[in-house]
Amino acid sequence: GSRAQVDKNDFSFMDHGQKIIPDFAYITIHGTPGENGILQGYFELLGIPYSTCDVLVSALTFSKFTLNQYLKGFGVRVAESMLVNKRHGISDEDVIAKIGLPCFIKPNASGSSFGVTKVKTKEQIQPALEAAFKESDDVMIEAFMDGIELANGCYKTKKNEVVFPITEVVSQNEFFDYNAKYKGEVTEITPARLSPELTSRVQQLTSAIYDILGCKGIVRVDYIITEGEKINMLEINTTPGMTATSFIPQQVRAAGLDIKDVMTDIIEDHFN
Protein backbone atom coordinates (compact mmCIF):
# COMPACT_ATOMS: atom_id res chain seq x y z
CA GLY A 1 0.00 0.00 0.00
CA SER A 2 0.93 3.66 -0.15
CA ARG A 3 0.49 6.68 2.09
CA ALA A 4 -1.60 9.70 1.17
CA GLN A 5 -1.85 13.12 2.77
CA VAL A 6 -5.25 13.71 4.39
CA ASP A 7 -6.92 17.09 3.87
CA LYS A 8 -8.28 17.91 7.33
CA ASN A 9 -10.78 20.38 5.87
CA ASP A 10 -12.97 17.52 4.66
CA PHE A 11 -11.00 14.35 5.64
CA SER A 12 -10.35 13.64 1.96
CA PHE A 13 -7.27 12.23 0.25
CA MET A 14 -6.10 11.86 -3.35
CA ASP A 15 -5.90 8.43 -4.98
CA HIS A 16 -4.50 8.35 -8.52
CA GLY A 17 -5.67 11.89 -9.10
CA GLN A 18 -9.15 11.27 -7.70
CA LYS A 19 -10.38 12.97 -4.52
CA ILE A 20 -11.78 10.44 -2.06
CA ILE A 21 -14.05 11.36 0.86
CA PRO A 22 -14.83 8.38 3.13
CA ASP A 23 -18.45 7.29 3.48
CA PHE A 24 -17.84 6.09 7.05
CA ALA A 25 -15.13 6.36 9.71
CA TYR A 26 -14.35 3.37 11.92
CA ILE A 27 -12.63 4.85 14.98
CA THR A 28 -10.11 2.71 16.87
CA ILE A 29 -7.90 5.43 18.42
CA HIS A 30 -7.54 5.14 22.21
CA GLY A 31 -7.45 8.13 24.53
CA THR A 32 -7.48 11.53 22.91
CA PRO A 33 -8.76 12.36 20.30
CA GLY A 34 -10.52 9.07 19.50
CA GLU A 35 -12.16 8.26 22.81
CA ASN A 36 -13.05 11.60 24.37
CA GLY A 37 -15.39 13.14 21.80
CA ILE A 38 -12.89 15.30 19.89
CA LEU A 39 -12.70 13.10 16.80
CA GLN A 40 -16.43 12.46 17.01
CA GLY A 41 -17.10 16.21 16.98
CA TYR A 42 -14.81 16.61 13.98
CA PHE A 43 -16.72 13.98 12.01
CA GLU A 44 -20.05 15.50 13.10
CA LEU A 45 -18.97 18.86 11.64
CA LEU A 46 -17.96 17.17 8.39
CA GLY A 47 -21.13 15.08 8.20
CA ILE A 48 -19.18 11.81 8.09
CA PRO A 49 -20.86 8.97 10.03
CA TYR A 50 -18.64 7.04 12.46
CA SER A 51 -18.62 3.84 14.49
CA THR A 52 -18.50 4.99 18.11
CA CYS A 53 -20.64 6.76 20.70
CA ASP A 54 -21.47 10.40 20.00
CA VAL A 55 -19.63 13.46 21.33
CA LEU A 56 -21.46 13.71 24.65
CA VAL A 57 -21.30 10.02 25.54
CA SER A 58 -17.64 9.78 24.52
CA ALA A 59 -16.75 12.78 26.69
CA LEU A 60 -18.83 11.50 29.61
CA THR A 61 -17.32 8.02 29.62
CA PHE A 62 -13.78 9.40 29.24
CA SER A 63 -14.18 11.30 32.52
CA LYS A 64 -14.00 8.44 35.00
CA PHE A 65 -15.32 10.37 38.01
CA THR A 66 -18.18 11.99 36.10
CA LEU A 67 -19.21 8.64 34.65
CA ASN A 68 -19.24 7.01 38.08
CA GLN A 69 -21.38 9.75 39.59
CA TYR A 70 -23.79 9.63 36.65
CA LEU A 71 -24.28 5.86 36.75
CA LYS A 72 -24.68 5.87 40.53
CA GLY A 73 -27.88 7.79 39.93
CA PHE A 74 -29.20 4.77 38.01
CA GLY A 75 -28.32 2.31 40.76
CA VAL A 76 -25.06 1.05 39.26
CA ARG A 77 -22.59 0.06 41.98
CA VAL A 78 -19.18 1.80 41.76
CA ALA A 79 -16.21 2.30 44.08
CA GLU A 80 -16.14 5.19 46.53
CA SER A 81 -14.10 7.98 44.94
CA MET A 82 -13.21 11.66 44.97
CA LEU A 83 -11.91 14.17 42.40
CA VAL A 84 -8.83 16.32 43.02
CA ASN A 85 -7.76 19.26 40.85
CA LYS A 86 -4.09 19.97 40.15
CA ARG A 87 -4.34 23.57 41.42
CA HIS A 88 -5.60 22.54 44.83
CA GLY A 89 -4.04 19.16 45.55
CA ILE A 90 -4.89 17.16 48.67
CA SER A 91 -3.15 16.17 51.87
CA ASP A 92 -2.21 12.61 52.73
CA GLU A 93 -4.46 12.82 55.78
CA ASP A 94 -7.52 13.78 53.71
CA VAL A 95 -6.97 10.89 51.30
CA ILE A 96 -6.75 8.41 54.17
CA ALA A 97 -9.76 9.90 55.98
CA LYS A 98 -12.04 10.11 52.93
CA ILE A 99 -11.02 7.07 50.86
CA GLY A 100 -8.65 4.98 52.96
CA LEU A 101 -5.77 2.69 52.02
CA PRO A 102 -5.10 0.88 49.83
CA CYS A 103 -6.54 3.01 47.05
CA PHE A 104 -6.03 3.80 43.39
CA ILE A 105 -4.86 7.20 42.22
CA LYS A 106 -5.47 7.69 38.52
CA PRO A 107 -5.87 10.43 35.90
CA ASN A 108 -9.53 11.31 35.54
CA ALA A 109 -9.22 11.46 31.75
CA SER A 110 -6.61 9.18 30.23
CA GLY A 111 -6.42 5.90 28.34
CA SER A 112 -4.42 2.66 28.58
CA SER A 113 -3.95 2.95 32.38
CA PHE A 114 -1.22 5.61 32.02
CA GLY A 115 -0.42 7.30 35.33
CA VAL A 116 -2.37 4.84 37.49
CA THR A 117 -0.89 3.82 40.84
CA LYS A 118 -2.07 1.42 43.50
CA VAL A 119 -1.25 3.19 46.76
CA LYS A 120 -0.68 1.13 49.90
CA THR A 121 1.10 3.54 52.22
CA LYS A 122 0.87 7.20 53.18
CA GLU A 123 4.33 7.83 51.68
CA GLN A 124 3.13 6.74 48.22
CA ILE A 125 0.25 9.22 47.99
CA GLN A 126 2.01 12.39 46.78
CA PRO A 127 4.28 10.60 44.23
CA ALA A 128 1.18 8.85 42.86
CA LEU A 129 -0.63 12.19 42.57
CA GLU A 130 2.35 13.67 40.70
CA ALA A 131 2.35 10.75 38.25
CA ALA A 132 -1.39 11.09 37.62
CA PHE A 133 -1.24 14.89 37.22
CA LYS A 134 1.25 14.41 34.37
CA GLU A 135 -1.60 12.82 32.41
CA SER A 136 -4.57 14.93 33.52
CA ASP A 137 -5.33 18.14 35.43
CA ASP A 138 -7.95 16.24 37.40
CA VAL A 139 -7.18 13.08 39.34
CA MET A 140 -9.58 10.49 40.73
CA ILE A 141 -8.79 8.81 44.02
CA GLU A 142 -10.72 5.56 44.22
CA ALA A 143 -11.19 3.03 47.00
CA PHE A 144 -9.56 -0.36 46.44
CA MET A 145 -11.91 -3.28 45.87
CA ASP A 146 -10.72 -6.87 46.14
CA GLY A 147 -12.36 -9.33 43.80
CA ILE A 148 -12.57 -10.90 40.34
CA GLU A 149 -11.91 -8.54 37.44
CA LEU A 150 -14.09 -8.93 34.36
CA ALA A 151 -14.54 -7.32 30.95
CA ASN A 152 -17.71 -7.57 28.87
CA GLY A 153 -18.30 -6.24 25.37
CA CYS A 154 -21.59 -5.34 23.72
CA TYR A 155 -23.00 -3.72 20.60
CA LYS A 156 -26.48 -3.00 19.35
CA THR A 157 -27.96 -2.19 15.96
CA LYS A 158 -31.51 -1.42 14.88
CA LYS A 159 -32.16 -5.14 14.40
CA ASN A 160 -29.67 -6.81 16.70
CA GLU A 161 -28.35 -6.87 20.26
CA VAL A 162 -25.14 -8.78 20.99
CA VAL A 163 -23.66 -9.09 24.47
CA PHE A 164 -20.45 -11.08 24.15
CA PRO A 165 -19.12 -13.78 26.49
CA ILE A 166 -17.34 -12.33 29.53
CA THR A 167 -13.56 -12.28 29.96
CA GLU A 168 -11.98 -12.94 33.36
CA VAL A 169 -8.78 -10.94 33.91
CA VAL A 170 -6.04 -12.43 36.09
CA SER A 171 -3.16 -9.93 36.18
CA GLN A 172 0.35 -10.90 37.27
CA ASN A 173 0.76 -7.34 38.52
CA GLU A 174 -0.92 -5.39 41.32
CA PHE A 175 -3.71 -4.44 38.92
CA PHE A 176 -4.54 -4.44 35.21
CA ASP A 177 -1.97 -1.78 34.32
CA TYR A 178 -0.27 -0.77 31.06
CA ASN A 179 2.19 -3.70 31.17
CA ALA A 180 -0.62 -6.15 31.80
CA LYS A 181 -2.65 -4.66 28.94
CA TYR A 182 0.06 -4.45 26.30
CA LYS A 183 2.99 -6.64 27.39
CA GLY A 184 1.14 -9.85 28.11
CA GLU A 185 1.56 -9.78 31.89
CA VAL A 186 -1.95 -11.12 32.37
CA THR A 187 -4.04 -14.26 31.96
CA GLU A 188 -7.35 -13.76 30.16
CA ILE A 189 -10.03 -16.43 30.40
CA THR A 190 -12.95 -16.26 27.94
CA PRO A 191 -15.61 -17.21 28.85
CA ALA A 192 -15.07 -16.27 32.49
CA ARG A 193 -15.31 -18.91 35.22
CA LEU A 194 -18.63 -17.68 36.58
CA SER A 195 -21.91 -19.36 37.40
CA PRO A 196 -24.62 -19.11 34.72
CA GLU A 197 -26.64 -16.89 37.06
CA LEU A 198 -23.80 -14.42 37.69
CA THR A 199 -22.86 -14.46 34.00
CA SER A 200 -26.41 -13.48 33.10
CA ARG A 201 -26.47 -10.70 35.71
CA VAL A 202 -23.23 -9.18 34.38
CA GLN A 203 -24.40 -9.35 30.77
CA GLN A 204 -27.77 -7.81 31.64
CA LEU A 205 -25.99 -4.95 33.42
CA THR A 206 -23.73 -4.39 30.41
CA SER A 207 -26.79 -4.14 28.17
CA ALA A 208 -28.53 -1.79 30.62
CA ILE A 209 -25.50 0.52 30.89
CA TYR A 210 -25.28 0.62 27.08
CA ASP A 211 -28.88 1.85 26.95
CA ILE A 212 -28.62 4.24 29.92
CA LEU A 213 -25.74 6.06 28.23
CA GLY A 214 -27.10 5.78 24.70
CA CYS A 215 -23.98 4.07 23.40
CA LYS A 216 -23.25 3.26 19.78
CA GLY A 217 -20.91 0.71 18.23
CA ILE A 218 -18.89 -1.71 20.36
CA VAL A 219 -18.25 -0.79 23.98
CA ARG A 220 -16.52 -2.73 26.74
CA VAL A 221 -17.56 -2.47 30.36
CA ASP A 222 -15.03 -3.49 33.03
CA TYR A 223 -16.18 -4.81 36.38
CA ILE A 224 -14.93 -6.23 39.65
CA ILE A 225 -16.97 -8.84 41.50
CA THR A 226 -16.59 -8.42 45.25
CA GLU A 227 -17.72 -10.56 48.18
CA GLY A 228 -21.34 -11.65 47.97
CA GLU A 229 -21.22 -11.56 44.15
CA LYS A 230 -21.66 -7.80 44.13
CA ILE A 231 -21.08 -6.39 40.62
CA ASN A 232 -19.10 -3.14 40.66
CA MET A 233 -18.55 -1.14 37.47
CA LEU A 234 -14.94 0.03 37.04
CA GLU A 235 -14.96 1.88 33.73
CA ILE A 236 -16.30 1.89 30.19
CA ASN A 237 -14.22 1.80 27.02
CA THR A 238 -16.02 3.25 24.00
CA THR A 239 -13.14 2.46 21.62
CA PRO A 240 -11.95 -0.87 23.03
CA GLY A 241 -8.80 -2.56 21.77
CA MET A 242 -9.25 -4.47 18.51
CA THR A 243 -5.93 -6.30 18.10
CA ALA A 244 -6.12 -10.08 17.74
CA THR A 245 -5.36 -10.59 21.44
CA SER A 246 -7.59 -7.79 22.78
CA PHE A 247 -10.68 -8.58 24.83
CA ILE A 248 -13.28 -7.85 22.16
CA PRO A 249 -11.82 -10.10 19.42
CA GLN A 250 -11.44 -12.84 22.05
CA GLN A 251 -15.09 -12.46 23.04
CA VAL A 252 -16.22 -12.35 19.42
CA ARG A 253 -14.43 -15.65 18.75
CA ALA A 254 -15.88 -17.19 21.94
CA ALA A 255 -19.35 -16.23 20.69
CA GLY A 256 -18.68 -18.10 17.44
CA LEU A 257 -18.67 -14.88 15.43
CA ASP A 258 -16.19 -13.27 13.04
CA ILE A 259 -14.86 -9.78 13.83
CA LYS A 260 -15.19 -8.76 10.17
CA ASP A 261 -18.90 -9.63 10.24
CA VAL A 262 -19.39 -7.71 13.49
CA MET A 263 -17.72 -4.59 12.09
CA THR A 264 -19.72 -4.93 8.87
CA ASP A 265 -22.92 -5.19 10.92
CA ILE A 266 -22.08 -1.92 12.70
CA ILE A 267 -21.24 -0.09 9.47
CA GLU A 268 -24.26 -1.36 7.54
CA ASP A 269 -26.57 -0.45 10.41
CA HIS A 270 -25.95 3.22 9.69
CA PHE A 271 -26.77 2.93 6.00
CA ASN A 272 -29.84 0.77 6.61
Labelled PLM ranges:
Residues 1-56, 60-62, 66, 85-93:
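ATP-binding N-terminal substructure of ATP-dependent carboxylate-amine bond-forming enzymes
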Residues 15-19, 58-148:
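Active-site nucleotide/adenylate-binding loops and adjacent lid/helix of ATP-dependent enzymes
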Residues 41-50, 121-126, 254-255:
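A glycine- and small-aliphatic-rich helix-loop capping segment at beta-alpha/alpha-beta transitions
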Residues 49-50, 78, 103, 259:
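Hydrophobic beta-strand scaffold residues
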Residues 51-52, 112-113, 187-190, 244-248:
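Short small-residue beta-strand/loop micro-motif enriched in glycine and branched aliphatics
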Residues 75, 196-272:
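ATP-dependent carboxylate activation and anion-phosphoryl transfer catalytic cores
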Residues 120-204, 225, 230-232:
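Phosphate-binding site of ATP-dependent enzymes
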